[in-house]
Amino acid sequence: MGARSRRNHGHLPQMKTRGRFLDFLSHSRPIKEGGERSNGPFSWTSCRAMYSVFREELEAERVARWEKRQSESSTEDTSEELQRRLQEVTEEVELLRTELEVTHRHLEGKHEALRILQGQAILDKATCHTKMLLQKSEERTKALEKEVNALQWEITFNQVQFKNVENSWSLKYERVLAENEALKKGLEEKMKEHQKQRTENASLSQKCLELLSMLSAKERRDFQRTQPSCSLRTDGSALELAVYGACQCNSNGGEPCSCARSAAASRKQVLQLKQELEQQQKRKDEAYVMMDAFRIAFEQQLRRVGENVLRQAETDRHQTHNQRHEKGKQWSLTVGERLKKILPTTSDGRIPSDSSETLHMLLDLLNDKEEALAHQRKVSYMLARNTENLEKRLLMQLEELDVSHEESKTKTVASEDYEWSRDCRCCADSCGSQHLSVPDDKQTYKANQPPSENRPETKPDNKDA
């Protein structure tokens, strides 16, 4: 009984140490029932810490046992007790071995659980990342689908617009082509009409030059003065074109019609009226110049007389009666001495002694001088106008002489061309006849020449010029 009680008493500290070790393990990692994980945080316990705790507990138990053995050795220290203790020690060693194996297995299970948890955590992270990537990719695909749909709609809309624009431009192009063809036809017709009018104008200008060459210099000058102003752009005014279109006379005989005669008479009347108007304008300008000269002289005379009167009134206001009398005498004496050579003498050869008479004489002389100067100014203006008119006339005469020379040259060239064409025709007729004959040069030349009566004079009239 005593041995069993000792064994039981010896097992008590062992059970206590095992219970403390299990409590330590439970505190290090609490495990739920059914093998489920706890929601609390996982705390890692190293093998060294567990071994140090286990070793401390064994040392404490050994110290307690050694004390007990010393206390018991004093009472009973026999061989049986030693055997019993040896057996207990061996049992304890086996028990410790089993506990170590259990702890090793428990640690291996913990390591496996850790590996599983780490794998699950990695899988959770990977799954979260993949879920986020999938969500982002889905959002991107949705946005891209929206953009693609919008772009497809824009493409279809632009294609429809391009088709409409292409159709409108094709219609415009066809219309412009039709208009261009119509304009080309109209332009060709206008060009033909313009060519005809140019040929007619050239023939008319040639006839006009021939007629001008037959006129004298005075008649030519009158004609050029009354000639209507025409330019290359506008060949005449609307009124002239209406008059030309109203004339329906047939001048087949080469004689001028009544419309042409009336037009020439009206041009002569216009020339006469222009000359009269120019003369009236010249007279008007001369009258204006004379009026301005007399007006300026009269204004200057009035201004000077007024200034003299004002000066005399101011001097009379500031002087007394005696001073006036004395200064009047002195002034009359000085003026008489100074103006002896200037003032005109009387029939007796004496100068008037009265100061008022001398003043009036001086004013009369001054007025005469001013009138003479105004007359000279007017005459100078008139002479300048006359010189300008003479210069203009001289330039016009020189221009007329140049024009007459040019007309004579053109007339000679035209006569030579006419003779050459006539000779060519005669040669063609002679070659085409059956009997070939070579005429004399002098005879053919005399025959081809126009008569002297019908030939216009090429030399200008020097007397008229």
Curated annotation (Swiss-Prot):
Alphabetized UniProt keyword annotations: Coiled coil, Cytoplasm
Lineage: superkingdom: Eukaryota
InterPro entries reported for this sequence: CCDC125
GO terms for biological process, alphabetical: negative regulation of cell motility; negative regulation of Rho protein signal transduction
Gene Ontology CC: one annotated term: cytoplasm
Stretches for region Disordered: 65-84, 432-465
Cell compartment(s), UniProt: Cytoplasm
Biased composition (Basic and acidic residues): 454-465
Cystine pairings recorded for this chain: none
Main location: cytoplasm
Coiled-coil segments on the chain, per record: 69-208, 260-295
Entry keyword annotation includes Coiled coil: yes
Protein's UniProt keywords contain Cytoplasm: yes
Protein known as: Coiled-coil domain-containing protein 125
Organism of derivation: Danio rerio (Zebrafish)
